[in-house]
Structures are given as C-alpha cells and as structure tokens.
From Swiss-Prot:
This is Scarecrow-like protein 29. It is found in: Nucleus. The gene is SCL29. Expressed in seedlings, roots and flowers. GO terms for cellular component: nucleus. It holds the Pfam family GRAS. Residues 119-128 have a biased composition (Basic residues). Residues 224-294 are annotated as: VHIID. Belongs to the GRAS family. It comes from Arabidopsis thaliana (Mouse-ear cress). Keywords: Nucleus, Transcription, Transcription regulation. The lineage of its organism: Eukaryota, Viridiplantae, Streptophyta, Embryophyta, Tracheophyta.
Amino acid sequence: MLLEETEPPNQTLDHVLSWLEDSVSLSPLPGFDDSYLLHEFDGSQTWEWDQTQDPEHGFIQSYSQDLSAAYVGCEATNLEVVTEAPSIDLDLPPEIQQPNDQSRKRSHDGFLEAQQVKKSARSKRKAIKSSEKSSKDGNKEGRWAEKLLNPCALAITASNSSRVQHYLCVLSELASSSGDANRRLAAFGLRALQHHLSSSSVSSSFWPVFTFASAEVKMFQKTLLKFYEVSPWFALPNNMANSAILQILAQDPKDKKDLHIIDIGVSHGMQWPTLLEALSCRLEGPPPRVRITVISDLTADIPFSVGPPGYNYGSQLLGFARSLKINLQISVLDKLQLIDTSPHENLIVCAQFRLHHLKHSINDERGETLKAVRSLRPKGVVLCENNGECSSSADFAAGFSKKLEYVWKFLDSTSSGFKEENSEERKLMEGEATKVLMNAGDMNEGKEKWYERMREAGFFVEAFEEDAVDGAKSLLRKYDNNWEIRMEDGDTFAGLMWKGEAVSFCSLWK
C-alpha cells in the first residue's frame, strides 16, 4: 500500500479540523501544537491460547470440564452491581484496652474516656496518613486485588482445585468493571484466570471486554484523543521520539537527503503531525521528501497495536502534510525484511512498545530483530519500551504476577486521568491494555536487558539534548502530578514513572 503526493497544492487545515469532532492540544514540542487525530490501517485479528503448551495442561484440562458447574455458587454475583468495599483493612487501629476495676474507680472525672477518645483519634489519623502514603508512593499495601489474584495463580500452578475455587468465588464477589482500580484489576484478572482454566469462549462470555479491534471507528478516534489528553503513557514517549529525530537531523543541518522513518509502534499516526509541523518550521526547511514506512503486523495480538477495521489515517496525514508544503509518502508493510532503503536518505527507526512481544528465551527473536535493524544501517534508532521485571513465561504464576503489576499501574493512572467513573474511553483503553493478561507470550523486560541487547546488536547509546529533556518535562506538567520523568545515565535514559514506579523508558541509539 502506497500513498504519495509529489506536488502539494495550497490547502488550509479546514478539511482536517472539520473531520474532527473534538481536538486536543498536547504541545509535545516547544512551540508546536498537536491537534490532529490520525487514522489506523485496516485490520483485525484474533488470538487463541494454546493450552497444550502450558505446564499445568493436565490439571487445566480436567479442571475446566467442571468449571461451569463449580461456579453455581458464585454466578449469582453480577460484576457490575457490586458496590460494597472488600473487608480488607491493612492498617487497623489498635484495640482499646478495657479498664480494670481499679481504673473504673478513678474514671469518675472522665479522664479515661478522654484518653480513649484521643487514642481513637490518633489511630484514625494514623490509618488515614498511612493510606495516603500508600497511594502516593505506589506502596502495595492498598493493592488487595493482587493479594487475591496471585495466590489463585499459584494454586493453579500447584493443581490445588479447592483453593482455586475458593479464590475464584471471592474474586467474583469483589470484582467490578466500573469500580476503583482494585475492583477493575480483580475483574480483568479473574477473566484472565478463567481464560487460562477454560476455553476462550467460556471466559469471554463471562464478561465482555472492549478492545481496539472491536471498536467503532469514531469511538476509537475519540478514545485516542481523550487518552492523549489525560495520560502521558504514550504521549511522552512520542514526544521524546520526535525530539530525537529532530536532534539527529540537526547534527548535519546542511544535509539535504530525504528523511525515511520506519514506524514500529502503536501511535496510530498520533505521533506524526507534531513532527511534520516541526520539520516545516526548521530554518533550513523540511527534507525534500519524508517517507514513513509503517510495520503493521496484523497477525500478532499486541496491546494497542491494531485498530478497528476501516480505520485509515493515511489520507488525513497526507492532507496535513500538503498544508505544510511537505512532500510526504506513506507505505505499509507487514515485515521488516521487506523495507526498501536508499543511500540518498536518512533512515531513522522508531521502535515503540512492540518488540517486547517477541520471544526472548530459547529463540531470541528480540536480539535477532535488533540485528536486522542494524543491518539497515540507520542513522538513528529510538527505542521505547515497557520498563518492567521479566520472568520466565514457562512459570504461569510468576509471569502472571509481573503482568498484574504492569496492569495495576495502567488502571491506577487511568483512574486519575479519567474523572468519569463509567467513561467509555477509559473502558476501551483498559480493555486493550489488559490483553496482556490473556497473552502467554507477552513479557516485559527491564531497561538494562534492552540496553544489553542493543549493544550486542552493534548500537551505541546517545544522550538526549537539553531541548528534548526540557520539552518532555514541559509536556509532563499538563498531567497528574504523580507522573514524573527521570533522566539517568548521563541523559541517555528517559524513564516515565507513576507514583515512583517505573512505567516505560525511551532511549536513542546510533
């Protein structure tokens, strides 16, 4: 698929603005305004878990036969109507000791009662203070959903059917798709555990989840706009990537080569209007031609990667480029190996939140892919990935626990970003994010391991310049103050944090 314009006519932005029912200004780069929603290419896919590859296959096969019958005692609870909070108190105030006979004799003046009131007040203040601290610093004390889901996963691994049934019943009582982050995590986790224990048809009928591939085009468009407005989850990495591209081009301002960007990402075009606008405002002007080659693998069920059928941002992005007098070409490929490069262009690769889906244990597909990228001789590579601990995917319970940590940060942050309790946009983003719980092959890794892979592939890390760092910090001030960016290792590592816990990282390589 190829879209190209060689002689851009004079045209205003009215056609772009009228296409949008809404707009959002993120100012990802100093002086520029990203107000244009882009479309995604056609495509949808399904994923089916292969139970025969799981170490607990024997137990699961026998247990799933009785799963429906086992739920007779639990199925009366509707996930949507649970409103009472779970009776989990991790910071209980100390009990007040009853006075003995001698103390009662001295209590006629109310002294003891006053002391009891003071103790009770102090206990309440202590509990509130502890709760606030837990919420602020990301402490796990208040995260009760994981304390139910993780033991259930361990019970599945141990083939302990009675404990599995116990935890599933408790979770079904507490889970809710419209409650707080704990209740929603309980609901998504419960669904994932059921999926692991039974066929996908049974688990999906238990509680339907909305994803990008099943969304209507207008709803998908509206959701992307809203998410970029309320969360830096992808907005900040996109910002850093665009700044890195400009940084690379600025190192040789007299270079008049074309710019070729390989997009291995999940932005659905949201990233590029700001970059195009920045290119048009350079003193030396934009490159003679800008090529964007999108690697769109519709066969991989990677969270956030595949939009709804009929969603195509190509024509809208071309129209925007024409208005800026930029000669833009967009190509879509399904394999990295099919890329056509030229010595007369500056090749830059943007790999964002897609490579962690590749295998990394027996067959190191991640390392092989990075070596394939190196063989293209790019002028720069921007790598943005989830920054999380890795655990062997062969251990279901350990891998599930790490995925729960990732999903908790997403759900907790969307609770702050989306103020409406039943926001449809939030449900769509969360449904897409929590696909990771159902995907046996989707494993994160820490930035140290990714840095090791990049060096083994022949890349050298490069520091972000001051403008890139300042632009990222300026963008982050638009969001909840629990978000922060940490620059480490001589500004070669930009880490996005939520309540002090690592979410993702962005890095630049040459």
